Amino acid sequence: MSCSIFKDLPEDHPRRLIPALCRQFYHLGWVTGTGGGMSIKLNNEIYIAPSGVQKERMQPEDLFVQDIDGKDLQMPPEIRELKKSQCTPLFMLAYRHRNAGAVIHTHSQHAVMATLLWPGKTFRCTHLEMIKGVYDDADKRYLQYDEQLVVPIIENTPHERDLADSMYAGHDGASRLQCRSGQTPRSECSDYLFSIAVEMKMAGLDPETFVDASKA
């Protein structure tokens, strides 16, 4: 870590946690190059990663801080010439309408492949163990192994801000798949499920259907 004025903050403070997670996500292949984004809400402060920065090199002082109304509270040093994440309008939707505590935008290859292999506007899978790690916000509970996970797929746009209406429209789940881009997820369980479901599709299996081998 650099000699930052924020070095004495606890490790779980957003100024330290966001750079640490972005480095982890970079090594997982979720935020390669300058792609992807992340934000964490702490009390009345919303911490937002900058745009156009290599995620594995991000520092605590690089973050933007604003309130729920969009008023800037703290900015990165001017010499860094940083811009706030283009995902900011989408982050704010989650905070204002879903009472989210954090939002992550990944460019997972598994999520991208899922948008290409699933026709229509939804990704679906069932009877996969990690479904139990996905929280159903509508029912306020975790899904069961034998239930169906449904994730909307929305069309990509040239600019992130133009996705706001599609992100907001008509779904109570925690994630969205952005066609040919990635996901705004409960990340690890979702990424695992996309990976397994894509492999099942490519092997000629149907992730949306359960086949009881004992009755075959």
Swiss-Prot record:
Subcellular location: Cytoplasm
Family: Belongs to the aldolase class II family. MtnB subfamily.
Residues annotated to bind substrate: 87
Binding site for Zn(2+): 105, 107
Keyword check for Amino-acid biosynthesis: yes
Cofactor annotation remark: Binds 1 zinc ion per subunit.
Protein name: Probable methylthioribulose-1-phosphate dehydratase
Function: Catalyzes the dehydration of methylthioribulose-1-phosphate (MTRu-1-P) into 2,3-diketo-5-methylthiopentyl-1-phosphate (DK-MTP-1-P).
Residue numbers annotated as active site: 129 (proton donor/acceptor)
Gene Ontology CC terms, in alphabetical order: cytoplasm
Cofactor(s) the protein requires to work: Zn(2+)
Enzyme class, UniProt record, top EC level: lyase
Keywords of the record: Amino-acid biosynthesis, Cytoplasm, Lyase, Metal-binding, Methionine biosynthesis, Zinc
Chief location: cytoplasm
